[in-house]
């Protein structure tokens, strides 16, 4: 038998009945039915049933008897239809089988510690044996789609005149780079490279170089606490262009995403709706709202100025600092019980709420703990503003605006999930625009996006009122990516550094190459980056970003497969001029 397959398993169908074929793969399952042996052969495409009958080929049957799970097999045989009533509708090849004429055991396997495709196996064990976990055809389908998406991205950007350029992986640490991964330099003792959190500065330098349109599918690194959609090393589609405005950049992003989704079997709108940052926060409590369902937050702070509750009345006195949000849930009073309302209250308490007030709309009128704290006039205005119907429930959140936005936005999502209001197959894109340039965190001014974003009203006295030409693209409540128009004038860049508390000496030390480049005729430019792993996670409806990365890290930033990170030898440390400080004993 030639060691050369003629088909992949799922390339065979009823049209191949009677043909001789050679297949290669792994034994997925093995069954001995009193002499006749059935082997489910698995390759990257899927599974097909092999049948070994001693009357057809004694030698093949002799080999088949010793086959066990995950043995590597090369099988030659003839395709035939399965018997009436023996078809398997769960398999793409469920109407046919292959009668073995020859069988080669190319390699044996130990008993696998995990069952291929068994999703009940713990993730740590699956990642430790990731090379086995990836044998699942479902995993192969994920990475085939990932490959299609990457090819589509390259073709799309190439078609729009973008040039693919690779930027350095070993680069310079920056002031905001507390989450940088550092690489010690052997030839420069005591000095370190940083792995890039993004190619931001290099792609700006390429615009100053006159490259006009750049892209790369870039590896990026960030040493941060992990969540379901975060990894310490990740991939992004990175794009930058010159002589453009915000609409130009967004148009390129929409065309790129349209081409990627088309290659993956989806049709999406040519253009996405826009939502300002302020409106997103006020109406949805999030700068990445999920708009697959209605249910906006409504401001009602003006209805509590005359409340007989001192706390509510005090909150209502400062409408700049505070918010009082109402969330009308259609049919919510019929859906939620006293017990489940208690669960929702505990849910919002985890995110800073003191409790969860509500009003139930019943046939006999309004009921609930909040009714007694509102005047007749305020209740009348509330009904006019929200227009609730019998069977609805209205939830309320009050307090400092950022806190209220956060927990009421989370409540909105949680209610929608519990009530089954979200269509998992719907793709809802939008742009969030007009972001603030800065935010204050414990009194310190920070850039909301990054310090290279072009501000709009830099002379505003209140830094929190300064806005930026920045934009995020959101899909189904997930930030898919974002970008901005960049600062291309040295004076503006220095002013932004100053507002961020970066002293001129520090700015010169850390960003001298950028500030120098801005003196030599930098063009107006802007760009964006799309989180590629996150994009594939959404396209495949995977619960975790780890499912779409071949060899991911755990939520503790470790690799169970390779046991990384790991200690290194004292000789290596010595060469790098590093000494590990011994842990001090505490008693």
Curated annotation (Swiss-Prot):
Keywords: Aminoacyl-tRNA synthetase, ATP-binding, Cytoplasm, Ligase, Nucleotide-binding, Protein biosynthesis. GO terms for cellular component: cytoplasm. Residues 200-203 are annotated as: Aspartate. It comes from the Bacteria. ATP binds at residues 222-224, 231, 479, 531-534. The record marks 33, 85 as: Important for tRNA non-discrimination. This is Aspartate--tRNA(Asp/Asn) ligase.
């Amino acid at each position: 038998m030639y060691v050369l397959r003629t088909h992949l398993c799922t390339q065979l169908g009823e049209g191949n009945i009677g043909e001789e074929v050679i297949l290669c793969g792994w034994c997925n399952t093995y069954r001995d039915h009193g002499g006749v042996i059935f082997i489910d052969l698995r390759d990257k495409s899927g599974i097909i049933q092999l049948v070994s009958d001693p009357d057809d080929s004694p030698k093949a049957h002799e080999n088949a008897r010793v086959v066990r799970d995950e043995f590597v097999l090369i099988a030659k045989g003839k395709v035939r239809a399965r018997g009436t009533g023996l078809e398997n509708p769960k398999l793409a090849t469920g109407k046919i089988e292959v009668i073995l004429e020859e069988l080669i055991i190319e390699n044996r396997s130990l008993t696998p510690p995990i069952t291929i495709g068994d999703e009940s196996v713990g993730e740590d064990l699956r990642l430790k044996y990731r090379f086995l976990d990836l044998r699942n055809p479902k995993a192969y389908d994920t990475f085939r789609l990932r490959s299609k998406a990457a090819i589509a991205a390259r073709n799309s950007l190439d078609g729009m005149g973008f040039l693919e350029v690779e930027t350095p992986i070993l680069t310079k640490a920056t002031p905001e780079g507390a989450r940088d991964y550092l690489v010690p330099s052997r030839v420069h003792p005591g000095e370190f490279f940083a792995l890039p959190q993004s190619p931001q500065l290099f792609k700006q330098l390429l615009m100053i170089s006159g490259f006009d349109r750049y892209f790369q599918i870039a590896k990026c690194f960030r040493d941060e606490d992990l969540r379901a959609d975060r990894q310490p090393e990740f991939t992004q589609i990175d794009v930058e262009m010159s002589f453009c405005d915000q609409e130009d950049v967004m148009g390129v992003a929409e065309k790129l995403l349209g081409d990627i989704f088309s290659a993956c079997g989806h049709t999406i709108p040519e253009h996405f709706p826009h939502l300002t940052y302020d409106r997103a926060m006020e109406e949805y409590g999030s700068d990445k709202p999920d708009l697959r369902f209605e249910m906006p937050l409504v401001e009602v702070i003006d209805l509590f100025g005359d409340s007989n509750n001192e706390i509510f009345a005090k909150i209502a006195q400062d409408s700049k600092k505070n918010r009082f949000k109402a969330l009308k849930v259609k049919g919510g009073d019929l859906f939620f019980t006293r017990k489940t309302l208690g669960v929702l209250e505990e849910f919002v308490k985890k995110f800073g709420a003191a409790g969860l007030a509500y009003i139930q709309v019943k046939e006999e009128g309004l009921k609930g703990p909040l009714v007694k704290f509102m005047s007749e006039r305020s209740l009348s205005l509330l009904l006019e503003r929200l227009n609730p119907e019998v069977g609805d429930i209205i939830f309320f959140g009050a307090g400092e605006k950022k806190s209220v936005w956060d927990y009421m936005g989370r409540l909105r999502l949680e209610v929608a999930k519990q009530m089954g209001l979200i269509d998992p197959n719907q793709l809802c894109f939008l742009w969030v625009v007009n972001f603030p340039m800065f935010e204050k965190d414990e009194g310190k001014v920070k850039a909301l996006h990054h310090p290279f974003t072009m501000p709009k009203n830099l002379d505003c006295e209140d830094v929190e009122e300064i806005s930026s030409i920045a934009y995020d693209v959101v899909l189904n409540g997930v930030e898919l990516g974002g970008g901005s128009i960049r600062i291309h004038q040295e004076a503006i860049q220095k002013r932004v550094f100053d507002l961020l508390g970066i002293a001129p000496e520090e700015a010169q030390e850390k960003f001298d190459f950028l500030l120098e480049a801005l003196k030599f005729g930098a063009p107006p430019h802007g760009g964006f980056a799309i989180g590629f792993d996150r994009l594939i996670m959404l396209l495949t409806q995977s619960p975790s970003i780890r499912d779409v990365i071949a060899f991911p890290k755990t939520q503790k930033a470790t690799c169970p497969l390779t046991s990384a990170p790991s200690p290194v030898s004292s000789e290596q440390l010595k060469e790098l001029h590093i000494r590990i400080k011994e842990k001090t004993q505490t008693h």
